[in-house]
Amino acid sequence: MATSNSTNGQNRDNVKIGMAVDIVLKEDQRIGKLTRGIVAELLTNSQFHPHGIKVRLQDGQVGRVQSIIN
């Protein structure tokens, strides 16, 4: 499992509306391309998701949080 200096996006408690995050869009999952944006809505109801909490960004894009920008 890869580790980084950024906060874990797998735990819902770590992800808040208004935060800057890097997400991976559904269509970019295979290549791992990240998209940066501001969280507008949390879409995952569970407290933990192994692939990242699903969010909608302010620009409407939806993906799973890979890292939280400090």
Positions of predicted regions on the chain:
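Basic/aromatic-rich interaction segments and small domains that mediate binding to polyanionic partners
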Residues: A2-N70
